[in-house]
């Protein structure tokens, strides 16, 4: 709630949230969807004075060995299709949490690709913004190229999002998008999580630009 009060976002995406104790509202934001099959999960909140959710998906992705042995997470993606009440335009926002660092980058790339494909089931060609913990602190140029091959852009925040241990410091939390103009992504001061939160300032591309992007997805 302190994070919301300080920055007043229109949408809030959470990872590793205590799903059994999530409130129905955080300030002016309502809960659109959360995972239910694991204690630490994902959630998406939205400003219901501006937006209306029309469809939701909670998706399990290809499992890592960590998932198979310790079983910490079932669903690693929560996607919501929203309608902007003033313009009537639809778009998709998702909260994503990739497999931990014990998994290979190839598995995380597979999860990212699968997640973006799953989101298209909410509305083919719609503007899409997927944010969260990608657990991909190195070789991001390669990841960016792979994402771009599928019609999306990868955007990092202005500072590292994990700083607790020197060896693991880096950008873990960022965004992939299509049909959005990402103005800025700012890394915010650390709260209770070991990851620093990020704040994304983004606007929908024009309908003509979105149509061009949709052809590439």
What spans do the regions from the language model cover?
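Metal-dependent phosphoester-hydrolase catalytic domains
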Residues: 21, 56, 81, 119-129, ...
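Structured beta-strand-rich core segments of catalytic domains in phosphoester-bond hydrolases
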Residues: 4, 11-90, 188-189
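Active-site flanking residues adjacent to catalytic metal/cofactor-binding acidic residues
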Residues: 15, 96, 131-133
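Alpha-helical elements of Rossmann-like donor-binding domains used by nucleotide-donor carbohydrate transfer enzymes
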Residues: 2, 79, 110-118, 171
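A long, amphipathic alpha-helix that forms part
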Residues: 104-126
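Alpha-helix termination/capping residues and helix-transition junctions
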Residues: 6-8, 50, 87, 122, ...
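Metal-dependent phosphoester/phosphodiester hydrolase catalytic core
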Residues: 87-106
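N-terminal, active-site-proximal structural segment of metallo-dependent hydrolase catalytic domains
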Residues: 1-26, 89-91, 113, 128-129, ...
């Amino acid at each position: 709630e302190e994070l919301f009060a300080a920055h007043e976002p229109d949408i809030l995406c959470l990872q590793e949230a205590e799903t059994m104790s999530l409130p129905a509202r955080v300030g002016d934001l309502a809960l659109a969807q959360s995972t239910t099959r694991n204690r630490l999960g994902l959630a998406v909140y939205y400003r219901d004075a501006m937006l209306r959710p029309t469809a939701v998906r909670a998706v399990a992705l290809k499992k890592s060995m960590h998932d198979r042995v310790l079983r910490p997470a079932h669903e690693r993606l929560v996607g919501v299709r929203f309608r902007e009440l003033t313009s009537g335009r639809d778009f998709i926002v998702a909260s994503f949490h990739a497999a931990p660092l014990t998994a290979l980058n190839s598995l995380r790339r597979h999860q990212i690709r699968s997640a973006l494909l799953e989101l298209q089931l909410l509305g083919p060609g719609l503007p899409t913004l997927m944010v969260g913990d990608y657990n991909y602190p190195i070789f991001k140029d390669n990841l960016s190229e792979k994402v771009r091959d599928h019609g999306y852009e990868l955007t990092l925040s202005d500072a590292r999002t994990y700083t607790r241990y020197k060896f693991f410091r880096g950008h873990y939390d960022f965004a992939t998008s299509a049909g959005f103009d990402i103005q800025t992504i700012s890394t915010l001061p650390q709260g209770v999580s070991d990851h620093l939160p990020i704040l994304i300032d983004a606007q929908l591309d024009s309908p003509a630009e979105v149509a061009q992007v949709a052809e590439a997805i």
